[in-house]
């Protein structure tokens, strides 16, 4: 037996910068993970005390080596240099990640000691405290700094590089997307899925009827044309109006569920909208560790991505058991910040797959919840036992021994008599030498006591019944100390409840004040941060009272509930379901704009002495009124101009009907002295900031503008109203479109400001009003109003109105520019697409070429490929054979394979009887396959190192999935077999997805590869026998060597046949094998296998056991050199073993029959074998009949060709005779002409009268 040898790694972090320190390990102690920094000095003292109590035989401290690096923290014994490293003896003391070190302490009394607290078990909340001593106390800060820096780097790496397990261990299922449903609540009855499916079918049938109806007839009122959802491509929406009543729905029967859902469906314009049947609705439903993905194999993109926290409900159909759906939260459109609940409905191939999906979802939710709970940081509440110990350690920190002892005695009185007696007895047993040692012992026993209590403690607010039961069981027989302790706890609870009550009262007062301030006045110059902080407190108090946390248990019928249990998610969900008015009232102090759907503006609140209103003074603002105009504003009788309360809708400003009330005049009077009007419109904070920046940024603003009269900041009429205040009173309520243009005067101060501060802009430039867009859609200011000037400066030039011709030219120019931009964008998209295609092709063909193709050979291939109508032209096969032997250019290989397939079809015009149905590729992709699990598993195994297929569910894997899925649907007998993914992958690397599918059909049906993938695998057994016979005939010594060690071809050659060498050999070699398969057929695989084994025969014969021989053939033999590969390819071109393969196949069947006849069997066994033989013979007869039919068809076609050739030959002979007669007649005429030319005296004969003699 050979000895087991291994090499131990001395340095644990060789690839990173690691630091090691020589230290003395004083000891360790398990403590609770809630141990705080004030407790740690007492823990260190306990560890040192326990270390001092060790026996004399054992050393008090242990020499260790501490290795620190960002990837780990490792402590191992420090051996002497003479002692050898033995991994069986010298195991590490502890090893952990540096981010698990959550506390470090340096002892100030003894600087050579330090301790670290390491999280060991997050589930049981256990930590370990290790205490070290350094020989040089000056190095302790360096050690602590190194550990902290390593933890910091490790945490940054975790954030930078997220976990890769989500995609690796994700479960994938193929589903058919049925439709999308908008529901009113995050819960739904189990019958929701069935009702949605029925509605989908009903609407689809109605739409189909509408499409089939003639266009001339008026269409009946029915569902509107289907529209896509804005959130996801190809997803449709259905709305539910009312909320589902969870309690009643769960207690009712299924029939009541049906009626309830029927009542919740919206009629009218919002109708059921299922998906488009013409689109490819198949999706890959991927369940990760914390998310659910919906990937479209057609578009190669993620169609939907939802976190587990967003999914609130999962359910399977009751009547439609092959359907399921889940409800999730989605953001509402329009940027309003709200959300709604959407149910997605899917279909699977069968019920078993739906059950598996539901079980996987439930397990994923459970695991994610456990992980989230484990990751949640442990916190102390006011009632925690360790919190009392923490406060005690804080109080005694820095005290001398005597004062510490007094504090400890006071604290011990709060314990029960039994606990006090136990601690006193334990301390007296150990006989402390001094007060300090006695204090350490008391703290140690208190820590143990409180840690035991902490295990049974439930934090404040957690629904745990143990504390309630314990509180109820407290009797009157408790000692006085315990009663005092109980009294203190009750007082603490009373304080907390009183504080919470006061805070809730104050929050309600803040809400009322916020509503009153909204309707009366808003302090726009107050601090935004203070407002936000106050409002956040108000929301945190008010919302928690208003919305109780709903239960989060799993539902019946395999349904799963919401994973997130935090109150914030429920608060956000419930607040979104409120009316806009309620939401608006709650956030009146913080929102910088009104909600979009506010039904009515809030009425102005009456001024009360209890509510103080701040003054709003803008001393740096510019007044747009003269003193005379301000006096006019305050005339009695309701003539004063005021700005209305602005609702969310944008009507033009109008006078408030209550403007004539006495209170309204009071507000106007206050407004003249700087206070806001009761109807003032609160403006956006961003608008005010922008306006202040605009004014403050101008360095030329004169100082005297500070002393101008303050202007109401809420008066939007000053900004966008085109008329003066005293002039707008008469026509403000009328139609402003028909009024003539009024003049508006600027004061001479305003003219100075407009000319000095912004001289480059006209006074009525639209840019002055860009920052007012958040006020609402008020009537725009007209650029045609002339401005009269009453100051010392001249009139300001107004912009002239453009003529219709100029406007037409501007429109024409804008349209032409837009057309040009669109064309340029299209060209850019085309260029980007072509660039992506080139990059994709380069990525696919990223392999080393075996036989470099010369330029002359490439020219020959390009000439043949560019021949017009090449699919109908037969090329010389000797020329094609020679070209393939000389090499195939890599960038033309896919096109050459299609060319060879076309030549095969021309050579064999009558295909075999087993041709598949001609179903379009796109139609196959729209169906679900039952082979999805096997295909999805093999996707990650197919060329895992190639960049095109390496990405999990990337473009390469999705295209490969589409091809394999389509073939499994096309060929139901074969379906999917392991090995097909490599064949399809090789094809996909050299051509497009649909072309690769066509070539896969050609290889399977025309080239005969389909037989070896049948479920019975009989053809594969025959192929193994044929390979053994070839070895026996061509390489007898190698065959004997393999038989001697009982190595059959199935141990090493099965993947060669099933994957066509693609799973083990380099891609360049496999591509050359495919070149020859397209040219010669499936017998090329035998030739390549025989050539490989024969060329490596000397090396195989050197190995003398089964393991080494098989390992050499599987691992060493595929790593061929370029020379050996070229030699193998050239040998394959010279081989011809077709007759041998046919003879070996017949031999296999004969031997099989002989073995069946010779073996003594019972009657039943003989009957079964005869039946199997009969069925196999029938199959062979059918195959022979097919071959006979093909041969007869070929014979008939050849006979017809011969007949055609004979008839054409007779016609050609007759034509030849006719031409011969005509030729002889012409020759006679030429002779006659020569004779006549020899006799010049005689008259020339008339050539027109000459006729050919004879026939």
Swiss-Prot record:
This is TBC1 domain family member 1. It comes from Mus musculus. Interacts with APPL2 (via BAR domain); interaction is dependent of TBC1D1 phosphorylation at Ser-229; interaction diminishes the phosphorylation of TBC1D1 at Thr-590, resulting in inhibition of SLC2A4/GLUT4 translocation and glucose uptake. GO terms for molecular function: GTPase activator activity. Residues 519-539 have a biased composition (Low complexity). Residues 238-398 form the PID domain. May act as a GTPase-activating protein for Rab family protein(s). May play a role in the cell cycle and differentiation of various tissues. Involved in the trafficking and translocation of GLUT4-containing vesicles and insulin-stimulated glucose uptake into cells. The modification Phosphothreonine is found at residues 499, 590, 1218. Insulin-stimulated phosphorylation by AKT family kinases stimulates SLC2A4/GLUT4 translocation. Expressed in highest levels in hematopoietic cells, testis and kidney. The modification Phosphoserine is found at residues 146, 229, 231, 489, 497, 501, 519, 521, 559-560, 564-565, 579, 608, 621, 660-661, 697-700, 782, 1028.
């Amino acid at each position: 037996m050979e000895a087991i040898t291994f090499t131990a790694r001395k340095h644990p972090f060789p690839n990173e910068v690691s630091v090691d320190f020589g230290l003395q390990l004083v000891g360790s102690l398990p403590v609770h993970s809630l141990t705080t920094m004030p407790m740690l000095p007492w823990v260190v003292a306990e560890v040192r005390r326990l270390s001092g109590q060790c026996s004399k035989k054992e050393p008090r401290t242990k020499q260790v080596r501490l290795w620190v690096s960002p990837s780990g923290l490792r402590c191992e014994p420090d051996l002497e240099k003479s002692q050898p490293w033995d991994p069986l003896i010298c195991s590490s003391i502890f090893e952990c990640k540096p981010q698990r070190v959550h506390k470090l302490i340096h002892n100030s009394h003894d600087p050579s000691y330090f301790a670290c607290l390491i999280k060991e078990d997050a589930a049981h909340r256990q930590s370990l405290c290790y205490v070290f001593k350094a020989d040089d106390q000056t190095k302790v800060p360096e050690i602590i700094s190194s550990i902290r820096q390593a933890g910091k780097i490790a945490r940054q790496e975790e954030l930078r590089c997220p976990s890769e397990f989500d995609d690796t261990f994700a479960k994938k299922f193929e589903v058919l997307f049925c439709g999308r449903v908008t529901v009113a609540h995050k819960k739904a009855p189990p019958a929701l899925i069935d009702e949605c499916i029925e509605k989908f079918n009903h609407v689809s049938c109605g739409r189909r009827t509408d499409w089939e109806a003639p266009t001339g007839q008026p269409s009946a009122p029915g569902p509107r044309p289907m529209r896509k959802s804005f959130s996801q491509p190809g997803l449709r929406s259905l709305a539910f109006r009312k909320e589902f009543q969870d309690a009643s729905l769960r207690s009712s029967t299924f029939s009541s569920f049906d009626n309830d859902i029927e009542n919740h469906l919206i009629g009218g314009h919002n109708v059921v909208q299922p998906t488009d049947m013409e689109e490819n609705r198949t999706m890959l439903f991927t369940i990760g560790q914390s998310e659910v993905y919906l990937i479209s194999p057609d578009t190669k993109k993620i169609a939907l991505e939802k976190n587990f926290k967003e999914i609130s409900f999962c359910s399977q159909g009751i009547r439609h058991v092959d359907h399921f759906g889940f409800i999730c939260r989605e953001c509402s459109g329009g940027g309003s910040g709200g959300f709604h609940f959407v149910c997605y409905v899917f279909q699977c191939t069968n019920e078993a797959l739906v059950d598996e999906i539901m079980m996987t979802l439930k397990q994923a939710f459970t695991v994610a919840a456990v992980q989230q709970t484990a990751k949640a940081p442990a916190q102390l509440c006011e009632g925690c036992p360790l919190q009392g110990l923490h406060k005690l350690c804080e109080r005694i920190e820095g005290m001398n021994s005597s004062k510490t002892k007094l504090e400890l005695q006071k604290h011990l009185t709060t314990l029960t008599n039994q606990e006090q007696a136990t601690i006193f007895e334990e301390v007296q047993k150990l006989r402390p030498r001094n007060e300090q040692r006695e204090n350490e012992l008391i703290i140690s026993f208190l820590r143990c006591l409180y840690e035991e209590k902490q295990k049974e403690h439930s934090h404040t607010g957690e629904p745990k019944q143990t504390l309630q039961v314990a509180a109820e069981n407290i009797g009157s027989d408790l000692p006085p100390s315990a009663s005092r302790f109980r009294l203190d706890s009750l007082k603490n609870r009373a304080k907390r409840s009183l504080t919470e009550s006061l805070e809730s009262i104050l929050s309600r007062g803040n809400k009322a004040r916020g509503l009153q301030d909204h309707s009366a006045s808003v302090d726009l110059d107050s601090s935004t941060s203070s407002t936000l902080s106050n409002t956040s407190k108000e929301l945190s108090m008010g919302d928690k009272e208003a919305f109780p946390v709903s239960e989060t248990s799993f539902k019946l019928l395999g349904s799963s509930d919401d994973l997130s249990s935090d109150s914030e998610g429920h608060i956000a969900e419930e607040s979104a379901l409120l009316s806009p008015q309620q939401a608006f009232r709650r956030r009146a102090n913080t929102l910088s704009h009104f909600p979009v759907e506010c039904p009515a503006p809030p009425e102005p609140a009456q001024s009360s002495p209890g509510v103080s209103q701040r003054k709003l003074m803008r001393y740096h603002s510019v007044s747009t009124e003269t003193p005379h105009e301000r006096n006019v504003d305050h005339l009695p009788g309701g003539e004063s101009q005021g700005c209305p309360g602005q609702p969310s809708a944008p009507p033009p400003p109008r006078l408030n009907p209550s403007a004539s009330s006495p209170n309204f005049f009071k507000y106007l009077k206050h407004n003249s002295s700087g206070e806001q009007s009761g109807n003032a419109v609160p403006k956006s904070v961003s608008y005010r900031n922008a306006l202040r920046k605009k004014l403050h940024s101008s360095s030329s603003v004169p100082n005297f503008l500070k002393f101008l009269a303050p202007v109401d900041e809420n008066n939007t009429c000053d900004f966008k109203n085109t008329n003066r205040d005293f002039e707008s009173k008469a026509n403000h309520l009328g139609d402003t479109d028909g009024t003539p243009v009024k003049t508006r005067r600027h004061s001479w101060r305003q003219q100075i400001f407009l000319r000095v501060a912004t001289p480059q802009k006209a006074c009525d430039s639209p840019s002055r009003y860009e920052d007012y867009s958040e006020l609402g859609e008020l009537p725009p200011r007209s650029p045609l109003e002339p401005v009269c000037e009453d100051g010392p400066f001249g009139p300001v030039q107004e912009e002239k109105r453009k003529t219709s011709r100029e406007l037409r030219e501007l429109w024409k120019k804008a349209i032409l520019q837009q057309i040009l931009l669109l064309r340029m964008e299209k060209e850019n998209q085309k260029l980007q697409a072509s660039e992506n295609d080139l990059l994709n092709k380069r990525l696919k063909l990223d392999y080393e070429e075996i036989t470099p193709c010369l330029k002359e050979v490439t020219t020959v291939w390009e000439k043949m490929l560019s021949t017009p109508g090449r699919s109908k032209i037969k090329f010389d096969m000797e020329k094609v054979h020679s070209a393939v032997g000389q090499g195939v250019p890599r960038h033309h290989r896919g096109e050459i394979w299609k060319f060879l397939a076309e030549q095969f079809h021309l050579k064999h015009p009558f295909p075999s009887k087993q041709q598949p149905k001609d179903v379009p590729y796109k139609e196959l992709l729209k169906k679900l396959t039952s082979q999805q699990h096997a295909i999805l598993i093999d996707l990650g195994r197919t060329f895992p190192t190639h960049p095109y297929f390496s990405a999990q569910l990337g473009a390469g894997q999705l295209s490969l999935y589409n091809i394999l899925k389509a073939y499994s649907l096309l060929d139901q007998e074969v379906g999917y077999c392991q090995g097909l993914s490599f064949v399809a992958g090789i094809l996909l690397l050299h051509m497009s997805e649909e072309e690769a599918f066509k070539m896969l059909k050609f290889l399977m049906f025309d080239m005969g590869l389909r037989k070896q993938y049948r479920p019975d695998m009989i053809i594969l057994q025959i192929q193994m026998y044929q390979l053994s016979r070839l070895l026996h005939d061509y390489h007898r010594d190698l065959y004997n060597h393999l038989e001697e060690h009982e190595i059959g071809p199935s141990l090493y050659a099965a993947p060669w046949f099933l994957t066509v060498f693609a799973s083990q050999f380099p891609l360049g070699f496999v591509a050359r094998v495919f070149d020859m398969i397209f040219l010669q057929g499936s017998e090329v695989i035998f030739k390549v296998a025989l050539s490989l084994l024969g060329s490596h025969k000397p090396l195989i014969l050197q190995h003398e056991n089964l393991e080494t021989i098989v390992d050499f053939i599987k691992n060493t033999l595929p790593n061929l050199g370029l020379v050996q590969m070229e030699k193998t390819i050239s040998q394959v071109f010279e081989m011809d073993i077709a007759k041998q393969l046919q003879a070996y196949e017949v031999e296999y069947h004969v031997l099989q029959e002989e073995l069946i006849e010779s073996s003594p069997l019972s009657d039943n066994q003989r009957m079964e074998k005869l039946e199997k033989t009969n069925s196999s013979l029938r199959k062979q007869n059918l195959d022979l009949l097919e071959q006979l039919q093909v041969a007869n068809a070929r014979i008939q076609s050849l006979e017809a060709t011969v007949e055609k050739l004979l008839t054409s030959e007779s016609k050609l002979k007759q034509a030849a005779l006719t031409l011969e007669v005509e030729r002889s007649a012409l020759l006679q005429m030429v002779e006659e002409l020569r004779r006549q030319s020899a006799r010049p005296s005689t008259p020339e004969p008339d050539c027109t009268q000459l006729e050919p003699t004879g026939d």
